[in-house]
């Protein structure tokens, strides 16, 4: 990984909720989606059901020179909607297991600094894009 970006949703009250992270290689090609723990990103916890609604019609708004980046990220969110939802369900299952093993509440698990990353899912670029063009049911 050369770098990564975090995608947030801004609530009506201005509070940020983390949707997902995207790791990038040195050329800027996507490597993996990831779901960090809440203490890593701060803000409000985004439930999987809410994330599912947001991923049905992602709407990233950037103006000026970053408008193209917003379009690219929006297309990636659409392309990877199903894998992202699967990753978030796996995140929730990992939190449940951690709570059971450690005797924690979900709120305590989300602030447990021993856990930085709950789940990730790989991106196989450009193979995934070709599969989407060819109609693979894995994508939108």
List PLM regions with ranges.
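Aromatic- and glycine-enriched beta-alpha-beta binding-site module
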Residues: 1-40
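Mixed-charge (acidic/basic) macromolecular-recognition segments
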Residues: 29-123, 127
């Amino acid at each position: 990984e050369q770098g990564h970006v975090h995608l947030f949703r801004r609530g009506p009250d201005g509070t940020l909720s983390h949707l997902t992270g995207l790791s990038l290689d040195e050329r800027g090609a996507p490597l993996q989606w990831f779901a960090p723990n809440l203490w890593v990103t701060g803000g409000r916890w985004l439930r999987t059901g809410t994330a599912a609604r947001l991923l049905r019609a992602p709407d990233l708004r950037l103006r000026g020179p970053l408008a193209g980046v917003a379009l690219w990220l929006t297309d990636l969110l659409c392309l990877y909607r199903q894998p992202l939802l699967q990753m978030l369900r796996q995140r929730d299952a990992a939190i449940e297991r951690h709570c059971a093993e450690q005797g924690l509440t979900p709120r305590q698990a989300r602030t447990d600094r021993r856990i930085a990353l709950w789940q990730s899912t790989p991106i196989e670029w450009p193979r995934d894009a070709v599969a989407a063009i060819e109609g693979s049911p894995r994508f939108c």
